[in-house]
Amino acid sequence: QEDVRAAVAYLADSGIRHIDLAGYSFGAWVNALAVNDGLKIDNMIMVSPPVAFIDFTSIANLGNLKLIVTGSRDDIAPAGMVEKMYPTWNPAAKFEVIQGADHFYGGYEGKLEAALMDFIASKCSS
């Protein structure tokens, strides 16, 4: 969390007014903990939050969580587990499952990129 907080503070001190976070696997958990503990950001993306491996039960009410992506074959971030948990994080967040992808998205990088870029483009145009 200290690294995330330091990076966000650096950006804010540099005059960046809108700060978004994206984290993959362990990074999704670290970002969620920091935001859950009060770190102020605008939007957050979680890619394959490792709910089968790390306890996410203390994380709730992440109003800035906008997108969660996982793969249908991800055994570290199983779609069914993530789908049950994300309403406690933010029921308004978009939940996307990439069919056939495992935790590492091998062969599905283009689909992951498309999901992320579609979301980012929608935020940039609004």
Regions found by a protein language model. Give the residues of each.
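Acidic catalytic loop of the alpha/beta-hydrolase fold
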Residues: 72-77, 103-104
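Catalytic histidine neighborhood in serine/cysteine hydrolases
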Residues: 88-104
